[in-house]
Amino acid sequence: MIINETKGKAWHGKVKLADTFLKRFRGLMLVKNVNHALVFVLPAETRANASIHMFFMLSDIDVIWLDSSRRVVDFKTAKKWRLYTPKKAAQYIIEGPVGLIRTLEVEEGDLISWTPTEEREKAVPVKSLIPGKINLNGSKNSIAMVESVKEVKANEV
């Protein structure tokens, strides 16, 4: 979700972060149907680093540039195969589907916040022992425990 805190407007779509070099490099290039927003977290607040290109884009997108305090410094609907640089230095860039700017009623100086959509990992069952050394593995009254693949590496018991 992306919120224009100044206007009290919200966009209830999926939000992903581009907070690494590779994620920022990939961006939304070659995405056929842009149905989510991508928030670029830049390493420094500058105009040059906040410049974007629309090469290899398959559709137009809305772009919002924010300074380090999350205030809008520039915004526009970006067309395919063009270059864009914000009017002022920016630390964050929000790219999303056309209509995002209209929905949020964005104007320069607005305060914008976002909540990244949690990406759920595939779950794997994990064998476990209950405290007190009671093993419920194989028991009819067992407790099924599941943890994220990223968080737990299941060991064979």
From Swiss-Prot:
It comes from Thermococcus kodakarensis (strain ATCC BAA-918 / JCM 12380 / KOD1) (Pyrococcus kodakaraensis (strain KOD1)). This is UPF0127 protein TK1120. It holds the Pfam family DUF192. Disulfide bonds: none annotated. Belongs to the UPF0127 family. NCBIfam families: PRK03760.1. It comes from the Archaea. InterPro entries: DUF192, Saro_0823-like_sf, UPF0127.
